[in-house]
Amino acid sequence: MKKISLTFLVCFFVQISISQNFKIINNEAIHFNLKQKNDIIDFIVIDTKLDVKKPIFLFCQGSLPLPLFVQPENEKMWMIGGGITNFDYLKIIEKYHLIVISMPYTPVVVGEKNVNESYCYVPDATKPDQFVDEYVKADYLENYEKRAKAVLNFLRKQKWVDNSKLVVAGHSQGSKVATLIAFNNKKVTHLGLFSSNPFGRIDQLIRDYRKSAEKKEITWKEADEKIERKYQMYMDSYDEKKCKSDPNLLAWKSFSRPLINDWVQIEVPTYLAYGTNDIASDLCDIVPLFYIQKGKTNLTYKR
């Protein structure tokens, strides 16, 4: 009897701990946080109830430390949600629990005075280009995958989650995170890629310099000098000592990993959508060629 009572109490307190680990924000989303060894991972479910069992749709946001919500001084709070508001997300939540993970060391809700013109979180409003040091050190691809893995492991154990399907999608930098998640997590059933660069990140800067020279916006000599500087920066990103003195190099190294090598190894249905005037995703036009070479038919694309 004592063993039964003890088991009941443990389950009871565990349930209380989980139920008190979230709150509703702006009557739009439920905020959870997971305490890790050296990090606290905040994420939201874009809904106000969890009474319907649905699969997970994880949306991986783009670059920079954007908060999930902004609180203006004299107006109603509004949701950025990692850019999910650019999509018809209300349609998504009809069939899925839509999840967005906050950027590392970035508050979920930030007052308007602490966001710069690009809506990035800045702790000191007088220094609009200076981000939190911890964020800069945490801003690399493998860390985003690690954080997402922790969130997905937590969600798989929840009674309101249908584990028969797992959709992972990402925009811009988030497409790189989504790719790595799908590449390493066999439970992912569908992958969505929006405004993605199949060859990483740094190559788009080099291509942009060439285009600028072609349009005579800069000289070919200037383009060559700029390209050489990018080569040097990328070389520096592989130098551990230089990365320690300049943590920004970590992001350039990790996010410049060519994605196309991963995409053609991923077996699940993959949806690729991109704009026609986007330097980052210019080379998406040749992605179908790689799938054809491999005899793969799991790619759907939209330009």
Label every model-predicted segment.
Residues Q20-P55:
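N-terminal cap/lid segment of alpha/beta-hydrolase-fold proteins
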Residues V151-R210:
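Primarily recognizes the serine-hydrolase "nucleophile elbow" in alpha/beta-hydrolase
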Residues Y119-D129, E134, G192-Q265:
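Accessory cap/linker subdomain of secreted extracellular hydrolases
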Residues L50-K95, P104-E112:
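Short, surface-exposed "cap/lid" segments of acyl-processing enzymes
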Residues Q293-R303:
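Catalytic histidine neighborhood in serine/cysteine hydrolases
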Residues I266, L272-Y274:
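Short beta-strand/loop motif that positions the catalytic acidic residue
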Residues I279-I286:
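Conserved alpha/beta-hydrolase "acid-adjacent" motif
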Residues E112-Q158:
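Alpha/beta-hydrolase active-site loop
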